[in-house]
């Protein structure tokens, strides 16, 4: 044993010996994280090998930088680089546990949101998490205890060259094998899981940095010709209004109710013999209500902000980060601006602070007249949970604010209580939790019931006030509530194994539209959040033909029932496409690649590509539809000057006095 320690000390006291030891530790730790934390969809032997192999080139290249330092400083720099890479890996692990996604450079600009997460972050931490820094600790101990005794020499340049040649060679082999299994990996991939699976988490960070820089320069290089190409494409996908529904809600108020993290399976679901959402179940059966039961969320990293962006603009969120934080000052042709020029007053009600998701900036670009944020509400400790005000006091305190608005109005109420990790006071829980053993899944049903009761109270007010009879009410789920990291618990809830296909089907969220005097019913056509704006505008009697919108009217006979996901997958009534595999949507059985699938994929890729071009290039500055006046963000100010909330005043055009 003593001889082994002496030999180890001699090896580790050599720059290359210590370097190789650190490389092996980082390599194995990263691979362990891949197989235990990430669901990357490994499907063949090449992918299994690459998952094991891909951390090696990153470890060699990045840790190799430390060899440029002399003597003991090389060891110190190696430890620092190892620590930074460990922090990056662990940050991705924690982020993935909730979002099932990886951190990108644009998401770092959303870091001001993290301070409001409250208990959500702690629910994502595990007792074994310190192990992600075990290799760093080992390296520090070896140096601090002088177990290693570095010689004060500088490594020869030719040896340094060999290290980097080896790293580049390893990466080249990695990339070559990846391209053989997934051709054009770096040029036609919308899914970050692909890059991590084939090239690794560290190389993904470099790739993402390049993509982010490319996107930031796209605006400077854009011109009106880009917009012409986009409009030519959209003219071929436009769905004309259905005369049966066009203008049925003309002149009516619009009330959006944002159902936070609400998945469609909750509707009509019974837990222990009790309906989880009795009010919403009954509301979907109202004689004037259209309930879309094949409606999917299409959010990416922006989650709630992506959902809002799609509903207000009928354009997709970004492949990395959030439009709200990264493109807030673009030119938009949003719903509040379109309707504002028809005499509507627009407002958002939200029990969180206005800076969350950069709403106080992006709403100005959308043309919202007013934004009632947390500063208008009583944010006492009893009524605040997680991200902000609980839903029942939120709706109660929103009523006097709503009463200040001139009609017709376009409004949105953003709820918060039904948010991960779904905490709820025992006194407010009116249904027992599920019993899967997964606390987030179990309490999800209790917070969903609380949301259901909150919405009922608000609808009761609308009926009593008379607003119910002259307002279009739109309820929508913004994104999933339970990610695929909880598949074991969800298998118990759904009574079947939650594989990739079943998880894709679970991305359904409710879309419920009630128009007074219009015949309702269950609508089975497939659609997504991108389709809501053209559907609503047509109900209000505004044709969308001249607007730049990537969705289409769900009620139009010409609506194409292919629902793109942000990562390039899609679902349709016949086919569900997931990462190069295809399934019969009705049965879940694998199907062969067909011409129909090829056409669908081309349409999905074009829609995502052109939408990204419009957003990244800020192309709407080059095109103004006839009759539309571009928004002037400087006109809007959301500062709460009047703390007496029942006395908030608005001018005739809905702006703050």
What are these language model-derived features?
Residues 2-209:
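Transmembrane and membrane-interface helices of multi-pass
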Residues 5, 13, 17, 219-223, ...:
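Intrinsic-disorder-associated interaction segments
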Residues 14, 71, 120-127, 223, ...:
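Membrane-interface junctions
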Residues 47, 72, 105-108, 112-115, ...:
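Generic alpha-helical secondary structure signal
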Residues 99-107, 122-129, 221, 304, ...:
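General structural signal for secondary-structure boundaries
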Residues 133, 197-217, 261, 470, ...:
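Conserved acidic functional residues
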Residues 174-251:
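Membrane-interface segments at or immediately adjacent to transmembrane helices
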Residues 234-657:
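Solvent-exposed soluble domains appended to multi-pass membrane proteins
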């Amino acid at each position: 044993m003593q001889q082994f320690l002496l030999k180890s000390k001699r090896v580790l006291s050599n720059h290359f010996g210590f370097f190789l030891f650190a490389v092996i530790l980082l390599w194995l730790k990263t691979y362990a994280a891949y197989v235990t934390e990430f669901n990357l969809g490994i499907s063949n032997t090449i992918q299994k090998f690459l998952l094991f192999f891909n951390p090696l080139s990153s470890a060699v290249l990045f840790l190799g930088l430390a060899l440029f330092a002399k003597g003991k400083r090389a060891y110190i720099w190696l430890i620092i680089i190892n620590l930074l890479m460990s922090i990056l890996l662990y940050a991705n692990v924690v982020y993935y546990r909730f979002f099932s996604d990886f951190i990108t450079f644009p998401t770092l600009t959303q870091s001001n949101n993290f301070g409001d997460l409250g208990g959500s972050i702690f629910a994502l931490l595990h007792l074994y998490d310190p192990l992600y820094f075990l290799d760093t600790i080992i390296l520090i101990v070896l140096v601090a205890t002088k177990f290693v005794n570095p010689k004060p020499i500088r490594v020869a340049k030719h040896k340094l060259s060999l290290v980097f040649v080896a790293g580049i060679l390893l990466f080249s082999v990695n990339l070559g094998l990846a391209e053989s299994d997934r051709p054009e990996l770096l040029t036609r991939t919308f899914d970050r899981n692909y890059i991590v699976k084939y090239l690794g988490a560290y190389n993904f960070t470099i790739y993402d940095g390049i993509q982010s820089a490319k996107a930031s320069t796209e605006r400077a290089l854009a011109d009106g010709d880009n917009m012409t190409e986009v409009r030519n494409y959209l003219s071929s996908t436009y769905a004309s209004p259905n005369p049966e529904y066009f203008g049925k809600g003309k002149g009516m108020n619009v009330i959006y109710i944002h159902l936070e993290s609400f998945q469609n399976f909750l509707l009509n679901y019974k837990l222990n013999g009790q309906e989880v959402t009795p009010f919403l179940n009954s509301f979907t059966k109202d004689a004037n209500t259209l309930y879309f039961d094949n409606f999917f969320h299409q959010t990416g990293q922006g989650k709630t902000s992506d959902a809002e962006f799609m509903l207000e603009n009928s354009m997709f969120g970004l492949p990395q980060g959030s439009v709200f934080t990264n493109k807030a000052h673009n030119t938009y042709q949003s719903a509040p601006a379109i309707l504002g020029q028809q005499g509507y007053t627009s407002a958002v009600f939200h029990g969180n602070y206005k800076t969350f998701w950069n709403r106080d900036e992006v709403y100005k670009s959308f043309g919202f007249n007013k934004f009632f944020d947390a500063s208008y509400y009583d944010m006492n400790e009893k009524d605040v949970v997680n991200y902000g005000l609980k839903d029942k006091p939120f709706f109660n305190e929103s009523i006097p604010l709503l009463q200040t608005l001139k009609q017709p109005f376009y409004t949105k109420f953003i709820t918060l209580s039904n948010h991960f990790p779904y905490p709820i006071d025992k006194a407010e829980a009116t249904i027992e939790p599920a019993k899967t053993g997964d606390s987030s899944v179990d309490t999800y049903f209790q917070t969903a019931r609380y949301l259901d009761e909150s919405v009922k109270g608000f609808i009761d007010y609308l009926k009593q006030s008379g607003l119910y009879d002259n307002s279009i009410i739109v309820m929508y789920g913004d994104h999933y509530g339970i990610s695929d990291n909880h598949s074991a618990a969800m298998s118990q809830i759904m009574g079947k194994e939650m594989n990739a296909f079943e998880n894709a089907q679970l991305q359904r969220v409710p879309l419920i539209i009630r128009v007074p005097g219009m015949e309702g019913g269950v609508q089975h056509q497939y659609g997504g959040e991108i389709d809501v704006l053209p559907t609503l505008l047509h109900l209000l009697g505004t044709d969308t033909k001249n607007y730049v919108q990537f969705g289409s009217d769900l009620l139009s006979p010409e609506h194409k029932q292919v629902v793109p996901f942000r990562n390039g997958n899609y679902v349709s009534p016949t086919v569900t496409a997931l990462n190069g595999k295809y399934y019969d949507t009705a049965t879940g059985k694998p199907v062969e690649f067909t011409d129909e699938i090829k056409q669908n994929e081309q349409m999905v890729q074009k829609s995502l590509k052109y939408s990204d071009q419009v957003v990244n290039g800020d192309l709407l500055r080059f095109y103004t539809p006839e009759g539309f006046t571009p928004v002037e963000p400087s006109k809007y100010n959301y500062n709460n000057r009047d703390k007496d909330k029942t006395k908030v005043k608005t001018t005739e055009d809905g702006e703050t006095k």
